[in-house]
């Protein structure tokens, strides 16, 4: 169904390698980092770099296409040029470790398109995962004030998913807060690190 997936668990990457070996296929992955939104991704940046190296060296059927981030979702952490520069710097660390350039540095989803729209997306980000902005067109208009996308429909799909990973992460988002994935400005209570 797809040739590239977002990954943030070593166990899942190993299982993917086994299945690719069984099917005699190669699958591309974007390894995710968490830059404060507390959604998916490696929280520990050294661990992310180590995992990227292990994918590169130890998983011949899993191709490390790049790294990525998700922002303005669970934790409502705003996509900013600073957050994107943090991702680009992390990509450079991975590239130095694996000895080649990454094909993909994925700067987020629809909410990150605002940086492109306003001309503030830093160089080095070469990929966005724009789904809602294309399929619904609501968030950019209603939540981010971009009005030139009103030709898009807002009733095109229903998404159902299974929870496939749980991690220990802080309960308070890191970075400048904006809106969450539902257009709300939630308040957070810092309860320390929790399994989620």
Predicted segments, located by residue:
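Active-site-proximal beta-alpha core segment in soluble small-molecule metabolic enzymes
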Residues: 1-101
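Active-site anion/phosphate-binding pocket segments in diverse small-molecule metabolic enzymes
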Residues: 83-196
């Amino acid at each position: 169904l797809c040739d590239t997936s977002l990954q943030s668990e070593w166990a899942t990457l190993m299982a993917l390698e086994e299945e690719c070996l069984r099917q005699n296929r190669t699958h591309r992955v974007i390894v995710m980092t968490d830059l404060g939104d507390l959604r998916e991704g490696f929280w520990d940046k050294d661990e992310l770099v180590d995992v990227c190296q292990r994918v590169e060296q130890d998983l011949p059927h899993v191709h490390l296409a790049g790294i990525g981030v998700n922002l303005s979702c669970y934790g409502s952490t705003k996509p900013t040029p600073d957050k994107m520069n943090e991702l680009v710097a992390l990509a450079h660390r991975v590239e130095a470790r694996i000895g080649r350039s990454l094909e993909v540095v994925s700067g987020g989803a629809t909410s990150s398109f605002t940086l492109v729209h306003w001309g503030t997306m830093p160089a080095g980000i070469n990929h966005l995962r724009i789904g809602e902005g294309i399929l619904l067109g609501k968030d950019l208009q209603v939540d981010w004030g971009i009005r030139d996308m009103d030709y898009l429909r807002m009733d095109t799909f229903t998404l159902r998913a299974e929870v496939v990973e749980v991690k220990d992460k802080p309960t308070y988002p890191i970075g400048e807060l904006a809106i969450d994935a539902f257009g709300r400005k939630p308040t957070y209570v810092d309860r320390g690190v929790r399994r989620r």
